[in-house]
Amino acid sequence: YGVSLSADNDSKSKAPGGVADFIFNVANTGNGEDTFAITVDGNSAWIPTASQSNITISAVSGSQFTVSVTVPEDRSAGAESGDITVTVSSSDGESTANHNVSVSTSQVYDIAIDHMSGFDGTATVTQETQLQLKLNVTNNGNGADTITFAMKNQPPWAALGSDSLLIGPGQTLPLTINLDPDTAALSGRDYIFQVVATSSDGSETTSPDLTAQIDVKETEGEEIVTEELDEDDEGGLPGFSMFVSLLALTIVVLSRRKD
């Protein structure tokens, strides 16, 4: 009687909910057919399971079976199963072989960007004044993620408050966008732009639209004085009554000279 055991890998990595399959090679090194019992010991939360409970192999021959390990849904990135021990035992009750494998949790990258509560994405800003918009950035993954940001279709007077954020799993942080339109920003036009977030694995998420509407800045000018005419001014012209009086006086003088 004799037996040997090996696996295709000693360790594998899967995302939460994923299943890691290990292929085991078992060899009968004895000189007769033998049936080997298969047992698996390990962290029960990871559900280590063999594809079969025993295997029959001819003399000096080999065969395979599979051990599957399921990563629990609630595991954070980097969490490990610990050793999972697989043992095959000969029918003689004495010849055995074992091999340890393990599984680690890979990181899931999942970013969401949304308008903050009570903000529909549209804001009005006056020329040569500053205004801040904010977006909520949420890490729905299972590990900390350094997220970088870039703007898309933005006007020249819009800028990010931060180029990157480190966000923990399940955490939400605000991202600020600064608006500082000059007098060249056109009133009556909607400036529509977005923010693109890139996770550490290179995956991208685009924010909903942000819209900036421009108000023209009011400027101080000279006070305009309006002169109101009296109702008895003929033709509505200032000084017209005086002109008529002078004309009448001239006619009278000329008449007297003729006399």
Features from the language model and the residues they span:
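Long beta-sheet-rich domains in secretory-pathway and surface-associated proteins
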Residues: 1-259
